[in-house]
């Protein structure tokens, strides 16, 4: 039996954002070890979701890892084998794929992407405005370095 306790309000908020018409962007941040990733994992358990855990590696290494996750998510050998130098191409491939239900894209430890490439928050803002916002997709940005998350996302 699967048990998930004391996060009903947060789950309802995420579900409400998911059910909105069009796109939704959710920023979830807080101290380490308070259950943010567990909350997200529970929320996406029955959804069509791509979960990416960023690392403290370089921007290029994170982009390559995200490309692999995206290629697996949309089942695209073309994307998997492509030499992708831009985050835009990966996000465009994700939203251009066909889905039975609204896809959810989770970028966990988002602050590491901004740490590896200081321009990443503005790059992501452009991707949101030009690609993601115009589609029916939910994006969750999650992080634990509170000051960095606030400066990068709010």
Q: What spans do the regions from the language model cover?
A:
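Phosphate-binding site recognition
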Residues: 1-154
């Amino acid at each position: 039996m699967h048990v998930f306790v004391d996060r009903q309000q947060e789950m309802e908020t995420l579900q409400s954002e998911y059910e909105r018409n069009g796109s939704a962007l959710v920023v979830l941040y807080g101290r380490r070890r308070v259950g943010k990733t567990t909350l997200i994992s529970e929320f996406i358990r029955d959804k069509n979701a791509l979960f990416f855990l960023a690392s403290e590696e370089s921007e290029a290494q994170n982009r390559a890892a995200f490309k692999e996750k995206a290629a697996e998510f949309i089942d695209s050998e073309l994307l998997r084998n492509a030499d992708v130098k831009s985050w835009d191409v990966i996000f465009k491939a994700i939203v251009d794929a066909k889905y039975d239900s609204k896809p959810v894209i989770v970028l966990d430890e988002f602050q590491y992407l901004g740490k590896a490439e200081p321009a990443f928050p503005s790059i992501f803002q452009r991707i949101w405005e030009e690609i993601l916002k115009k589609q029916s997709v939910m994006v969750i940005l999650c992080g634990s370095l509170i000051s960095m998350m606030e400066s990068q996302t709010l």
